[in-house]
Amino acid sequence: MRFDELDLENEILDGIDAMNFQEMTPVQELTIPIILQTGTGKTAAYTLPLLNRLVREGNSDNRVRSVIMVPTRELAQQIDMQLEGFSYFLPISTTVVYGGGDGAGWDQQKKGLLMGSDVVIATPGRLLSHIANSGIDLSHVKYFILDEADRMLDMGFFDDIMQIVKHLPQERQTIMFSATLPPKIRQLAKQILHNPAEINIAISKPNEAIVQSAYICYETQKMPIILDLFTNNPNKKTIIFSSSKQKVKDLAYALKRRKLSVAAMHSDLEQEQREAVMLDFKNSKINILVATDIVARGIDIDDIALVVNFDVPHDPEDYIHRIGRTARANADGVAITFVSEAEQGKFHKIEQFIEKDIYKIPLPPELGEVPTYNPQAFERRSHHRNKHNKKRYFKPKSKSTPQNNKGGL
């Protein structure tokens, strides 16, 4: 289905055309008509109908009209950039609200919120701080959107979100996007949604253009493998993902000692530092970015040739998000995952999830012997360790327990 088949304002269609968008993705095709009726991916699925409704309703001075809640400042910035493109021909104002930076950033955000903004894109903690300290009025918000809601809950934002909801009017349109539906998400949905239309879309598999492979190794062999890898491929634009800030710092330091063009991205960096690193990486001033999952979702850089998972991600969906940074815009890409003994069970779940046996690269002989790939043994070992702790992971079956009253979407 094409965008010009939708009942969108001409100025919005002009913005879509200027961004070279023509055909809708499945999530856009399913969600845009519903959002329009009731009130590059999922961001456009809600921003386009939102802009359309804001334009048709006309401007409203000194009021916040819509709030888009996101887990990270990086995603907030990306959505703001996409909104700028779509609304290029529209009289729409946006304010981006996230932590970090200096006092000037806080003052600028406060000014935008107090003067009124058609669209506020915010992280929960920062918006709650402005509500508490800046006298922000959200009583006229008509559209409340939660993007990556599951990730926000993983980061501990449930209470912040519920506090923000208390400042919103009862009559509003609420839209929630979530990659997964754990009990906590269903609880949130039950509390903030009213008779929602539920749309389920199959989780996408990795791009077929990505060549996926893995090294089965001991944990102590990972650093020698990475150094060997970049001795032979020093100029490939690469993201190396690790689940630990300390590992990110250690990796970046080790690669810099090899005179490689590398930078680190993690939550200890100030906002200005993060933006400078991403700009240098996008402009190829650095070739290798070592990062935590802070950049696994939503970073729009088309020419990344290689993704390395220094650690196996905890969830299969995180794996897809990580390797999805390569093979973009019809390009080819390579994804390599380092799998230690303890990570074999997690890696096997990824293979099951994507329904593919990932090729195991033989380790260079000079790096020594490698462990046997036997993930079932590690799964059995993990099950044995946890069999006495089931109450931590499963709800009691008693009807009197609060968990059983959470309901569904």
Predicted regions and their residues:
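Conserved helicase RecA-like core
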Residues: R2-P371
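Basic Arg/Gly/Lys-rich low-complexity intrinsically disordered segments
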Residues: N59, N283, E351-L409
